[in-house]
Amino acid sequence: MEGILAFDRELDVALLDRVVQTFYQGVGAEQQQAQQVLTQFQAHPDAWSQAYSILEKSEYPQTKYIALSVLDKLITTRWKMLPKEQRLGIRNYIVAVMIKNSSDETVLQQQKTFLNKLDLTLVQILKQEWPHNWPNFIPEIVQASKTNLSLCENNMIVLRLLSEEIFDYSAEQMTQLKTKNLKNQMCGEFAEIFQLCSQILERAQKPSLIKATLGTLLRFLNWIPLGYIFETNIVELITNRFLNVPDFRNVTIECLTEIASLTSQPQYNDKFVTMFNLVMTSVNSMLPLQTDFREAYEESSTNEQDFIQNLALFLCAFFSSHLRPLENPENQEVLLNAHSYLLNISRINEREIFKICLEYWSKLVAQLYEEMQQIPMSEMNPLLNLSSPTSLISSNPNMLANLPLRKHIYKDILSTLRLVMIENMVKPEEVLIVENDEGEIVREFVKETDTITLYKSMREVLVYLTHLDVVDTEIVMTEKLARIVVGTEWSWQNLNTLCWAIGSISGAMNEEMEKRFLVNVIKDLLGLCEMKRGKDNKAVVASNIMYVVGQYPRFLKAHWKFLKTVVNKLFEFMHEYHEGVQDMACDTFIKIAQKCRRHFVAQQLGETEPFINEIIRNLAKTTEDLTPQQTHTFYEACGYMISAQPQKHLQERLIFDLMALPNQAWENIVAQAAQNAQVLGDPQTVKILANVLKTNVAACTSIGSGFYPQIAKNYVDMLGLYKAVSGLISEVVAAQGNIATKTPHVRGLRTIKKEILKLVDAYISRAEDLELVGNTLIPALFEAVLLDYLQNVPDARDAEVLNLITTIVNQLSELLTDKIPLVLDAVFGCTLEMISKDFSEYPEHRAAFFQLLRAINLNCFPALLNIPAPQFKLVINSIVWSFKHVSRDIQETGLNILLELINNMASMGPDVSNAFFQTYYISLLQDILYVLTDSDHKSGFKLQSLILARLFYLVESNQITVPLYDPSQFPQEMNNQLFLRQYIMNLLVTAFPHLQPIQIQEFVQTVLALNQDSIKFKLALRDFLIQLKEFGGDNAELYLEEKEQELAAQQKAQLEKAMTVPGMIKPVDMPTMEEEEL
């Protein structure tokens, strides 16, 4: 096999064929050897020179593909280094092979795959050579296409690929200037290409040529001037000639969809309407509106199903861009006809098609709602010259009946859409009970992200539909519920989708209407729960009751009796053993507790005491059938209620009563342990202790700063237990070795330690009196925890220690500065030793370690200046190691630490900052340039760019006043600016010998000049990186910042818009009102 690696003699192509065949068809060691040899062959810098021989002589297709991939690599990375004659020779050879394999129809079909790869290689050459070194390419390919039908077919594919490379994929593969030049060239020479396409589509009879030309036209349509579309006959031509032909209709309607997506000046409106009428006439003849689309889709071929999906895409694209001209009276018939088609398509049981339709429905109802909002109240009722409150309009649709609103055009369409949305409603994430593939009702354990996203979109549409006609929405929902209750439409699916839809419109009705509607719904559901027999039926109804009530906190807050009834019903469900019911009852309870907390601690009219008193009194009975995790949720829910009690002495009493049971268990075990330490050897005791601590964590999480009396009560015993447990673990490890840390007993003991740490963390992160924390909690905590962490074997160290210290540093900030050396002595060196051996061991410690470093740098920076120089050097080394890490999160943390450290140092006095930069500037610069040009670290581009710009600025602005070089090694006129230029030049020339020195020199001058303009600096940096052969592959991550900014801006705009629409943000997701925080 190694014979193919002998580049000093002619390649044995037959041997290469056998090696490739072994790789693809062999097994075991022989296959691995073939893989190794082929990898070496492809990596060899002279491998491309064998491509001609391989393409001419090889008998095995995969071998030819390898030859083309080697050529592709040459073209994309070293093309400019080749002499002009060699470049011309390769280009002419590729063209010749392409013509040879595409001029004959039989050969074209046989060599289709090879030819496709050959076309891609030609396009890579075009990106390098055209137009400057190949100015006649477009005229040549157009002329050649007229000589031979099969050659013409392949040329269409080449033109399509070239268009895709320039207009679709260029952003992340070529520099900005190169992309702009190629786009201008393509547009400038398009007339010839368009004329060729038109001639083919008018005259050709060969199906594969027609399909290839339509496919190529499809790629042109999103960038060519509109004159080519509407000032020629191309639309009529493709619609009349190809839309009704099964073989061509999919690619034809894709072309029409691309045209429909274009936005234009009003002068083309009539052209768009004419096109739409043409298409809908064909659609009505091919697929009559009366067809049962759901059934027809199920029975259709793949080609026919694709057409229905493409029709949905066409309708949605056209409506999204050109709806208003269709709303003119003369076009309303075709408008409503087309919307009826879209409604029928929306009923098809295919999620991807429904999502296409949903995107348009969402736009339509949002537009109609916004128009409605802009009508002044004075136009609806001159007596009320006020701005229009949404709830008044929503609850009085008749007020709008006489106004010229667009929503009136769509009245029947919107009424049907309400039913379609209800029938298709997907499961909200709060619902834990689902029907599995076997038709059984079970608890769902894995949430589907796609379903959650789809639910949010459907919910938005239903909220808008409610505002557009609240009366019709109520009628549609109550009539459907009535049919379910009487049994004519009873099914789990029908009840689920209806209740999910009812829950989704919470907040969209005014309070009076919501009350009437919801009272009827909940009464019907409670009656259904009593009426239905069978555990599965009851579980389905129960889950829907819980979901609906959980979505309407405003209603519950306004109707105390109903709230109390609902909560007592939840307590009943907590004794129901059907899978998922108890979980959902607890989740709904905590949701209601968060949103209605004040109502539980206030004494309501007609009650003898606040409801929280009764809940705590019956706590043991209510939670007796719950799992420990569910019980913790219950305690957390009670904590939210207690946090709303404004009177401190009453709040403390409630906390005392709430924690009575866990405190009793705690005190019993602590008393026993004081008498006999062996108690902690009992697994059941360990389990009880862990559970008690987790209960405390749950309550502390929701009660917050007010939990101090409970913390203080058990704090000394807790730290004593921490030490005792740690001693037991050490004894077991000493006796049994490291393996002991994996045993159930030691794992149980470690859980106790972790929960103690989590409890302290939970309290300190919410504490308000930080001096009290610093003076009373921290000294004893550090005494118990730090030395223990240092002395433990690595496998017995808990990452929670690092998390807790990070919380303390973030909370106490400069109050903790004097204790940072103590902290670093205990946790820094030993943790660094654990995580620096590789990139994978101790992942939790790894993440926590760097988060701690960042917290210290941000909050207690002066402490870092006072640690010994060797330890400080270790800190710097660990930061560098973190941003060279393979984990994205750790890379990002490391880069943030470095940027913040550089800024901190630059803000210090010259003595401190100069000393730091003189020691570390050059090594840090080298490390940043390393990760910047390394393909495994592309995700850090944004922060790498900011750090580099900051480092350059410090030199260019003379903020560093000491030499960054050894003055004895350089002439007297040397300065930092000149040294930096030379240093970066030498570094890059050495690292990337394939780049011309002039390229590197221009890059260095540009980025140094742009160090204060972060956007231009980043663009220049990105263009340079794309040129690097080592930086090949997918460069999408270099654009991550723009994508993140765009997404953040979209999310912000969506949130601001949603806040203006009642019900658009779920009441349970709304920020808690001030009154609830009392």
From Swiss-Prot:
Residues 34-100 form the Importin N-terminal domain. One of its GO terms (biological process) is protein export from nucleus. Changing F992S: In crm1-119; LMB resistant. Disulfide bonds: none annotated. Pfam families: CRM1_C, CRM1_repeat, CRM1_repeat_2, CRM1_repeat_3, IBN_N, Xpo1. PROSITE patterns: IMPORTIN_B_NT. Belongs to the exportin family. Interacts with php4. Receptor for the leucine-rich nuclear export signal (NES). This is Exportin-1. It comes from Schizosaccharomyces pombe (strain 972 / ATCC 24843) (Fission yeast). The lineage of its organism: Eukaryota, Fungi, Dikarya, Ascomycota, Taphrinomycotina. The gene is xpo1.
